[in-house]
Amino acid sequence: MKLLVLDGNSLVNRAYFGIKLLTTKDGRYTNAIFGFQNILLNLLSAHHPDAVAIAWDEKAPTFRHTAYDGYKATRHGMPQELAEQMPVLKQLLTDLGFVQVSKPGWEADDILGTLAAANEATGGTTLLATGDRDSLQLVDDATTVLLATNRETLPMDPAAIQEKYGVAPPQLIEVKSLMGDASDNIPGVPGIGEKTALALVQKFGSLQGVYEHLDDKAIKPKQREKLEANRELAELSHMLGTIRKDAPIETAPEHYCRTAGDPAAAAQLLAELEMHKLTARWGLDESPAAVAASAEALPEVQPDLLPLAPEGRYDLAQNKDGSWYAVQGDSVYLLDNDRLPSLLDAAGVQLRVFDAKPLYHIALEHGGVGAAIVFDGKLAAYLLNPSASDYQAGQLAAEYAAAPAFACAAAPDAGALSALLDVLSTKLDEQGGHDLLVTMELPLARVLADMERIGFAVDAEGIRQFGDSLRAELNGILQNIYAEVGYEFNLNSPKQLGEALFDKLGLPPRKKTARGYSTDAETLESLRTYSPAVDDILKYRTYSKLLSTYVEGLLKALGPDGRIHSTFIQTEARTGRISSTEPNLQNIPIRTELGSRLRGYFVAAPGETLVDADYSQIELRILAHITGDEAMQQAFLSGADIHRATAAKIYHIPESDVTHELRTSAKAINFGIMYGKGAFSLGKDLGISVKEADTFLKTYLNTFPKVDGYMQNCIEHAKEKGYVETLFGRRRPLPELASSNFQVRSSGERMARNTPIQGTAADIIKLAMVHVWQRLRDEKLQARLLLQVHDELIVEAPENEVEQVKRILKEEMEQVVSYSVPLTAEVGTGKTWLEAH
């Protein structure tokens, strides 16, 4: 029998510390539960075990603590955020049918050793999944350790251990007894490190063998002294480090075969934890009808034909096969392609829908605007909980306990749809988010649908030629690198690149990882002056990314109409920003000359011009308004260059004396303040000492005193409420602020400072998009809104409409809100995006 045994504590710790803090909308921590399930699912998929045991440590002291008071004495307690997840995870595993095992007085390691030995005795094979290298001593021909590392899971068999350490698996106990283990506070022999311990065990076989050969010339005099003086510690360490194989637990492998568990309870718990994709991975059904059916029978409803003259309110949603249905009371109507478009703009009809954007696509394709749509449950769910990873009607119905009124085989989620939309509407009203939905998010969904439908024209031949030139450049750069290093190697292999730079060329290594030398961008940047090869490697990486991600990616996405139709996502960013995918048009490079050339291949259609409008320093203007800082407001009101004005104020010099370097420093501080950067990060950005950066920050905050006060208030209010808000009332939960982990808490504080500003900027550009789109239609123009990138809008307009469109963009973007500091938009035109911006 193939038995998989998980070291529960080791793996749950890796999950907790390896994944950013996640919470449900009601503040329950979930990252460890989420990560542990992914680890378990991946192990099951990769190894298909016959039985699975999950071993846990108990809180009670073990026999090792009794033998040595200092055992694990340096360990910190479990973080509160993880401790809260443990009982939930264990209950979920029980509901999923997994057998868990623990024993007071024994560690999970001993359970792993006991189960592996017992299974081997019956002729079985065992896989031990852990992140703890202590378990490597258990490896033999029948037992393999699946060692979880930061990047991958490494199968460790006897050959792998011999290759890595130069000893057999059981000899690792002997090594530890000499070198000790700081993580478990096992003392070892003071002054004997890993290298020496390995050498001694390789020569003498064991701890006992070392002490039997203390007079051997291979043992240096100082080493001999340490060994003689600390023999008792070494023998104690040997006992502490040896994993026992006789824990008093059930050892029959059959005992650990997975049971049926309680699928309904597991599905319900996963719904409460908002882990909908994992529900699907476990093969569970969490649809409201399925959950309800487990408790009581529901009346079965057969779909009907939509009335020829529909009126009143209907609730619309989409089945998994893409078909649409409507619910009115206890009636379900399947909507075909003939009836659906007319329903979306029908007079006397109000439609509450789940996911409006595809419906707006249909309406626009048929000459309508989806005027009957009055509410979108998906957008409401996003506004209520922007941290969720997915928004599906069936999953949300389970999450919000929206009970189904009936069952319908043709539309499994239909029975709970109206109840779900009711509860989402009520909760959004209670949160004060109704206006945000109706005036911004819902009309924006229509705008995004139109932008997706229209697309952006590109010069495909120009992109192909650009790709050819990049390939030629890459080949030349590659040959230069080979010549500089002296041989050919795989430049995309970090290991081979590290060997070339640090072993062959002799460059000073900056960082080392478990896999070898670090060759990340930061490391290479610090080595530029040592060899021309480094500069070429950085250039090679830049060109390769341009070619694979942008050139080849854009050509793949090109539609038959010669335009690229990106997908705009409204429910992804926690700050409220819109994102773009397939392809991501918001990430087209602009900071480098070569990267910005790509924008030159985004073109206006024949006879048309691109009109590009970009907000000027919108986030700083919001900062000046939101903080009420008179000095900052005055700088904007006077029309000054804000960065130059800031430099003049903090350096106490006339603006005319501000150099480019001083302006750059002021710009870094202006934006650094918003993003919560401290002296260390700012110093790194500016290439100055931490002390100098700290002086800059203090001077800045003295110059703009209300900025610092506002930032501190943001953090305090967020800690009190558990969330921050934009000026439009958009909420972002910040569970990170309650973390006991300093780094996580600091990250939460940075988000508390920045989100009200960045989120308000996102809201402003969204509202501007809605107003611009509507005004173009109201004035019956042929011009069309094509793209939004951060604070920039791009419109494609016929030549005779360009001046009118320029005026519309400027007016609507600048007048969308009325703040103490006016918003300004800079407008340009051109035949390409590069030229227009």
Predicted regions and their residues:
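Noncatalytic, basic helical substrate-engagement surface that gates or grips nucleic-acid strands
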Residues: M1-A129, R133-P155, A159, L233-L236, ...
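Non-catalytic nucleic-acid-binding/docking modules located in mid-to-C-terminal regions
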Residues: D50-A53, F98, A121, D140-T144, ...
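Active-site-proximal helix-loop-helix substrate-binding element of RNase H-like nuclease domains
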Residues: E152-K176, S183, G322-L448, A472, ...
